[in-house]
Regions:
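Pre-Walker A adenine-sensing motif
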Residues: 7-21
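Walker A/P-loop NTP-binding active-site region of P-loop NTPases
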Residues: 20-92
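NTP-binding/hydrolysis catalytic cores, primarily Walker-type P-loop NTPases
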Residues: 23, 130-134, 277-293
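Short acidic, S/G/P-rich loop/turn micro-motifs used as interaction or catalytic elements
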Residues: 35, 162-168, 228-231
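Conserved inter-motif catalytic segment of the P-loop NTP-binding fold
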Residues: 60-165
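Conserved ATPase-coupling elements of RecA-like P-loop NTPase cores
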Residues: 164-175, 187
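Charged helix-capping and loop-helix junction motifs
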Residues: 171-178, 235-241
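Phosphate-binding/switch region of NTP-binding enzymes
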Residues: 188, 192-289
Length: 293
């Protein structure tokens, strides 16, 4: 049975996508910093409240620089106060069964300590330290996603990814690759095994009571590019191992030149399994997010 499309919360964009995004797939939204990716992602996540019964979850991979302003955008655009999951030294995996403890809208696994995201920029000891830090936080990251999924969340937005020359050089892409294949796309009971480990048998009945279909969970990856102009994004080649090669849908946001004026426009470069518009769609950034002309 065909599942209803996931609305982006932007009618003009839904029309360009043939009715919306296909549930259970990965969408990459690509564009330079400041072009409107985060606002599009926040709108998409919030639309889950009306369509799925639960708002989506935003996973922030920022490790340096300023915040992506997700909380401010959510409050201003949607009147939505993001519930942030707090990462602590110790936690009880069984807390995922409590909506009050498990439901969150914003996960930020790493502090903004100025750590560079490119593996080649790290000293060997820094890379080893990072991997150890990642393993310490991985259980709580899995609990953050699983605790949302068992309570009805079906949309995930990944933000805060810095541009690199090669995706394989960035630990952010390595982490996303793990999360997408080993968390978002994993059967619910196998993900529960990863979380509860030796205690899985004692939790198995609750795991089955909270079963969900991982094929209904969609991911939106906000990809910061070096390219600023939409024309350059459209002509950008897809490299071997590039995240774009595995995405079901690619949405490009970039600057366009119109005489003496520079504006913004969107183009759906790929939408596998669906009809989509071939138009370049001009838009503006307003208080409520992306406004199409």
């Amino acid at each position: 049975m065909t599942r209803p499309r996931h609305s982006t919360g932007i009618p003009k964009l839904d029309d360009a996508l043939g009715g919306g995004l296909i549930p259970g797939t990965l969408t990459v939204v690509m564009g330079a910093t400041g072009i409107g990716k985060t606002q599009l992602g926040v709108r998409y996540a919030h639309t889950g409240a009306t369509q799925d019964g639960q708002t989506g979850v935003i996973f922030d991979l920022t490790t340096r620089g300023d915040s992506q302003n997700q909380s401010e955008y959510a409050q201003r655009m949607c009147g939505w106060k993001l519930r942030e999951r707090q990462f602590s030294g110790h936690f009880d995996p069984a807390s995922v069964w409590s909506p009050e403890l498990a439901r969150s809208d914003y996960l930020h696994a790493f502090t903004r300590g100025g750590r560079r995201v490119t593996i080649g920029d790290m000293q060997p000891e820094e890379w080893q330290e990072f991997k150890a830090d990642l393993m310490r936080r991985l259980d709580q990251t899995i609990a953050g996603f699983y605790g949302n999924f068992v309570h009805g969340v079906r949309r995930c937005v990944i933000d805060g990814v810095e541009p690199t020359n090669q995706d394989a050089d960035s630990f952010q892409f390595h982490l996303f690759d793990y999360l997408y294949h080993q968390v978002l796309r994993k059967e619910h009971d196998w993900l529960a095994r990863d979380l509860f480990r030796v205690h899985f048998r004692s939790q198995e009945q609750l795991v089955q009571q909270h079963a969900y279909n991982c094929d209904t969970i969609s991911g939106m990856f906000l990809y910061t590019s070096h390219e600023v102009m939409l024309e350059d994004l459209i002509s950008r080649p897809i490299r071997s191992g590039d995240i774009l090669s595995n995405a079901n849908t690619i949405i490009l946001l970039g600057k366009v030149r119109d005489g003496a004026r520079i504006g913004r426009a969107l183009y759906v470069a790929k939408h596998r399994g669906s009809a989509c518009s071939e138009e370049i769609l001009p838009y503006r950034i307003v208080d409520q997010g992306l406004a199409f002309e």
